[in-house]
Each structure stands twice: as structure tokens, then as C-alpha cells.
Amino acid sequence: EAAGLLPFPRV
């Protein structure tokens, strides 16, 4: 989803 935007990718 917001991988790269947030410091932790949603899995």
C-alpha cells in the first residue's frame, strides 16, 4: 500500500 511512504510497510 504505502510502502516507501511510511517507515513500516503494511503487511
Swiss-Prot record:
Q: Could you tell me which residues carry Valine amide? A: V11
Q: Where in the cell is it found?
A: Secreted
Q: Per its UniProt entry, which superkingdom is the organism in?
A: Eukaryota
Q: Name one GO cellular component term.
A: extracellular region
Q: Which GO terms describe its biological process?
A: neuropeptide signaling pathway
Keyword Ion transport assigned to the entry: answer is no
Q: What are the entry keywords?
A: Amidation, Neuropeptide, Secreted
Similarity annotation:
Belongs to the periviscerokinin family.
Per the entry, what this protein does is: Mediates visceral muscle contractile activity (myotropic activity).
Q: What's the protein called, per UniProt?
A: CAPA-Periviscerokinin-1
Q: What organism, scientifically named, is this protein from?
A: Karoophasma biedouwense
